[in-house]
Amino acid sequence: MTEPIESIEVSLGDRSYPIWISTGLTESAEQPHFAKHFQAAVGDCTHVVLIHDAAVSNTIASRVEKQLEQAGIRITSISIPSGETSKSVSKLESIWNVMLESGTDRRSVVVAVGGGVVGDLAGFAAASFTRGLRFVQVPTTLLSMVDSSVGGKTGINLPGGKNMVGSFWQPQMVWIDTQSLSTLPDRDFISGMAEVIKYGVIEDAEFFCWLQDKAARLIEKDPETLRYAIRKSCESKARVVAEDERETSGRRAILNYGHTFAHAIEATAGYGVCLHGEAVSIGMQMAAHLAIDMELCDRSLLEEQTAVLSAAKLPLAWKDADPEKMLPVMSHDKKVSHGKLRFVLPDRIGHVAMVGDVPSEKVIAAILACRDEPN
């Protein structure tokens, strides 16, 4: 039987924080679990800037707002349209202006309620306004629960690249209520599965084996199975972040498996056309093809990865993949060193390595391998 609430610690010294995982504990105004954990995490607070996805304005965001108001906290509510196009300079500026007009100061706390877009945008607003405000994440999508809400990466997109402007800004707390997944559209839920599967490939072979057996139940949103997958994913993310918070040792870069290709797919397709998790799934396939071509692993790894991604109903190929458009975008990837592309590539299930000086013709071949037909 799953406990009513579970916790995972992100160990970063005096900036450590908890990830709370529950089901339905944001629902009750009579038992304000969120407000109590919020106050324990942030301490004294009389003003919250609640930045939320418009899609959850009348559900979990309104419940969070009600609990905080009942605790005597003044709320400034900012609704953000869904989609990657909201991660823009203009949207960030509009948030800053509302914060200024509402009397936001260094004692205020920013609370992000929504998916990865809202978390990234609100986190960067918190990091930059008055040189830094306390920040709390309330992720409402599978992808944001297992990935973007944990680790402190915040930022916005530029026309030429994803997440090109941002900062590391750790939250005071991450509050995951899996009940919010019950209303998440199937496409968005499945998109998040890519990041769950990623953890098995990069770091946890035992978890990957579990996913091979449980992918179908996850798609059905079986509560116990879902809670376990979220907890295991958060444990992996917390472990890697604790070892390399700001990507100085290279350890944290393993979390970018498939992402060099994925970000180029998103940018060339147009933000929002291909969901992030969908792009990551295709990017993982491209990375596996590249690893085979670089003789880092044999084809069985690709076959195992393909089987799990397929079971999760994730895309394996993108018919519009164009190396001529993708390579220039990839040249701006943050893992580029001395003008050379570097890739996170698997050598076996449960382990990846950073590989540099990859010939461009091999990158092109990997892209083309995932263009015309499923693997």
Curated annotation (Swiss-Prot):
GO terms for molecular function: 3-dehydroquinate synthase activity; metal ion binding; nucleotide binding. Keywords: Amino-acid biosynthesis, Aromatic amino acid biosynthesis, Cobalt, Cytoplasm, Lyase, Metal-binding, NAD, Nucleotide-binding, Zinc. It is an enzyme of class 4 (lyase). It catalyses: 7-phospho-2-dehydro-3-deoxy-D-arabino-heptonate = 3-dehydroquinate + phosphate. GO terms for cellular component: cytoplasm. Binds 1 divalent metal cation per subunit. Can use either Co(2+) or Zn(2+). Transmembrane segments: none annotated. NAD(+) binds at residues 82-87, 116-120, 140-141, 153, 162. Belongs to the sugar phosphate cyclases superfamily. Dehydroquinate synthase family. This is 3-dehydroquinate synthase.
